[in-house]
């Protein structure tokens, strides 16, 4: 749908901003700034100016959230005018401060930001990208990786949030409608978002670096002047994940996976040290695989990241404003995994199975296996991303709420696929009981009527379902390489069959667990540990 060919060769387009154009309209009664907040802002400005990354990270991850809880739980941080004179009108710090300011508004203010604030936030991002992208040499700015990830993630989130806000015409005043439809057509425009993310990827040469690393070469050789700096390199990497998310929100799942091609999705890398980034990547990759009917790849993606979350949750449980998002995405991935296991049964790790049992997913999985379409729909609507339309409603559209149109479209696409497979779990359950089974007998089981009442049409319908079973159980499965789109056709069913005249011949293809290899590895590991302990003596 959207690819690199859509963008101008000169790269990033500069969206100017007249600072006096919009009055930040948040209704914030004046109150004196607390002394702790003043000291924090002055010190924060100082460490950013001096590039003390460790201290910046400490202030960003710990002090800022703590002060937000203490003084600004349900109100905005001090305005730009109140802060600027404290930091000697440091323009770069003010851009970074306003990024946190508007992020706080989106996260904490119950009624949400006003239209003016949404526009101001967009122009502030423009100022930031105008500062780092058109530069002829790398800017002297160092920020911790967690901030860079959350900056890109928030940029995409605010685009998504604005697209939904823009589609909700029923609660807008005439003035807001005029501002949205006539005066701000480029604000949070999809091409602008893609333009920024692709420009960051291009400037950092992150794809070349990832390909060089995969080939065993030094990424520095191809990084270029900008890509050698951690600031640009990590922004480029996180922008790839941002593009994955944007294309998923638009329903372009092929492009979502394709944009990650330099990244070996199923392998850990030096870039996977930000838990929220790794979890978000797996969520959108797994969802894209599911919508492309690549259930084996989706199950492997979800199972792998859910195991990672189980084992590392204590490491990040008290970090970052994104913890609520991580917890929600974890719950969503269990729902998506349950859907995939119903549509494409296969063995998964026992600890994941245990969670599915403990949280009562099995009851709903049983309903889905019995063809309960409403349960499928409920699971999908809860677990899917908040889809958006790339374009606003037309200016002459009736005043209505269009925000659910994108979700309803994707839900209908998914439910069409489910309806095609509705009879397959029942067919599978009967086939597993036999090695040979007459077509007439299976048709009788399926329709719950005596065999002598089965007509030709019933047999034809059954043959259609059996052909569907063969087709749906054959999927492309990733085997190796950096492209998540490539793979080999494999049968995902634990049984196979062929039809000879009026008889179905069934073979169980389930591979038994090889416990011997597991114990051999553990014994060898124990012997190695024993040798090391003896050497210490």
From Swiss-Prot:
It is found in: Cytoplasm. InterPro entries: eIF3l, PCI_dom, TPR-like_helical_dom_sf. Residues 301-513 form the PCI domain. The keyword Cytoplasm applies. GO terms for molecular function: translation initiation factor activity. Transmembrane segments: none annotated. It comes from the Eukaryota. Component of the eukaryotic translation initiation factor 3 (eIF-3) complex. This is Eukaryotic translation initiation factor 3 subunit L.
